[in-house]
């Protein structure tokens, strides 16, 4: 039976004194304080500079964002502290193959910018569930996807980031875990609720710069310490822990020696930890779900000035996604060389002694190197990098979750809600999500496993493929209708939940004690399972759609690929119902506004609730046209297309080099 650690054991395990004392000096603390002050200053500047008093201003930054902050925000929204912990940890455990999750994303970003975003913008939507409502009609798809997306935010996105951030906080600051997380989430929630998407994007840009600078510095220290790249490749394959026996266990050499294919990304289709067919066929499916249908990501692309800026932002982020191999994966592998007994520990009692967890300490590879290698001041900078990655991801999740709740759920409960009420509801929901996140921390703490990145990717493989299948068919197959899409999602969700719940119930097992989960359910690698789930959902969707009535083209103009350039007027499927609701709501009357005191005016300014001048009918039409415009300047179109081709060539080359 596998050794386990109860929550109380984790809480009572003392942190190693040398690590917890590392940040207790004036230089490091000063850098961290300066970081927080600068981030808050940028957030406040964005809060005062941008228009947050309208739905479009708060949730889409008024569609006035340039390509470079959008690209930085896309990168920062994706790269959280769980990447520094998860990618480095899996790199330490098994080598470079884990970077394929990042490199696949570079290709998906091009598909996002060239195929999916033009459809989303032409449809005039703010959220992904809203797109499904326009494309298929009805409300059950919109509500279902909104609730599922919020569920994924809590159990996957937020939980992974908080868990990874908690590792740094515990090691570096020695603070109480819950106090530190509460402070981080509180700061994050404040400038998300007050600043809107523009504030999030500008702070993401700052934090991307901090992340890249700090990560490059640590990479330099790491390669210098290990003696260069050639020395690194030689020493890694010999990095085995000194203690490989104990706890009355018979431990196989494969559990503690580096893999023979550590420096290759394409591994055996059956025995590989990341099999090569899964990389080619399964990984793009989960990447498609995350990058092309995920509210957190797509919302950033919907705020671009024009399509050229959107495409340039996607290219910028795609290039940045090539860096984690050198900034995270290889430093994690170097950490195994430098701190072998801790990072590569295999005997449960030894692992508990080093990091308080019996399943392994690979998740501590990057944090340990930060605290051991970096000099004073730079240690504070690197902790700021970790905090930056954590907070940038959380702000993105909070803002997008707020958008989902407000646009897709709250408007169903309060059909006559004013714009001001919707803005307030969105902000309050962020605060509620903060509370839920804190409550979730104990569950994350006791469910930690040896490799965080495999946890996040497996959950994505169980929940994401049905969503990806429906969006692909919605855009490329106009014959698909609401009944097919709904039941395709339902069947896919049932299949995914059966696999996920069964795996949680039996456990994923470890090298020391394999899981007892039935092979028919858990015996298939999660990347292979994502392929089955994707095409299974697609077949159900197509089959039911072909057996039921098609949607007339008049309802599909600019909502699917073959009709994307149509200039015909589109009639929404629920147009009659919508018209009746507007009639029932009545016309909003203009009442003379009462004089407001200084404190109330300051409150409105801080929360973005101040009213701007009322738009004329012509101005409203111009704004609506701007929000659905996909035009490009010819010169910019040529530049971004050339860069896209160049990027694809680079991605193919690096895959071949490390194959």
Swiss-Prot record:
Residues 1-28, 86-105, 192-208, 292-314, 444-455, 548-637 are cytoplasmic. Pfam families: SSF (PF00474). It comes from the Eukaryota. It is a multi-pass membrane protein. Its main location: membrane. The chain crosses the membrane at residues 29-47, 65-85, 106-126, 172-191, 209-229, 271-291, 315-334, 424-443, 456-476, 527-547, 638-658. Signal peptide: none annotated. It is found in: Cell membrane. Residues 582-591 have a biased composition (Acidic residues). GO terms for biological process: sodium ion transport. GO terms for molecular function: solute:sodium symporter activity. Residues 573-592 are annotated as: Disordered. Residues 48-64, 127-171, 230-270, 335-423, 477-526 are extracellular. GO terms for cellular component: plasma membrane. Glycans are attached at residue 248. Inhibited by phlorizin. Expressed in skeletal muscle, where it may localize to the neuromuscular junction (at protein level). Expressed in small intestine where it may localize to cholinergic neurons of the submucosal plexus and myenteric plexus (at protein level). Detected in kidney (at protein level). Keywords: Cell membrane, Glycoprotein, Ion transport, Membrane, Sodium, Sodium transport, Transmembrane, Transmembrane helix, Transport. Although it belongs to the sodium:solute symporter (SSF) (TC 2.A.21) family, lacks Na(+)/glucose symporter activity. Belongs to the sodium:solute symporter (SSF) (TC 2.A.21) family. NCBIfam families: sss. Does not function as sodium/D-glucose symporter. However, may function as a D-glucose sensor by generating a D-glucose-induced depolarization which is pH-independent, Na(+)-dependent at neutral pH and probably H(+)-dependent at acidic pH. This is Probable glucose sensor protein SLC5A4. It comes from Homo sapiens (Human). The lineage of its organism: Eukaryota, Metazoa, Chordata, Craniata, Vertebrata. The gene is SLC5A4.
